[in-house]
Amino acid sequence: MIGMRPLRSLLASLTAVCALAAGVTVAGTAGPAQAAASDCTGGARGFRDHPDDASGDTHKPRRIEMGGGIVITLEKGVYVGQQIAFGKISGPTFPGDKVWMDWKADGWDQGGPPGTAIRPWLQCGPFTVQRIGQSLTTPFKRTSTDPAYQFRVCGSLNSNHVVRCSEWW
């Protein structure tokens, strides 16, 4: 017979493996280099604003089921002939739910004012749901095939404030 302590340890390990297999990270990572919506709105750092009801291609590179039918996705699409990525929260959202997109681009992040390199990444957001059922997107940015140029989507619900992030894409 397995004792309760080893069983709990086994279940915790299995839960962690399942979360990793699903491509989901639950909190506990290093913080971003910067965390202000103004770092990626209004054309800052090459990000572009677009409507909150925007959707990308049918294939979503990353998807997190937040619970209660609320979904956070990393969307991709095409804008003026270039592939782009952005984050989105949708479903029966509530005021205070949040979405943001992290961008890391080692070697691509130079050229700004001194001291503004993006290390370890730039957090684009958070953007906060204002009304029940509101879909909300982050600004978009062009993508690259360079493995040093990556995105992930993160979010939290007002009901529990647990931050969840997808794997990098």
Task: For every predicted segment, state its role.
Residues 1-53:
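N-terminal prepro-regions of secreted/extracellular proteins
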Residues 34-169:
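Post-signal peptide N-terminal regions of Sec-secreted extracellular proteins
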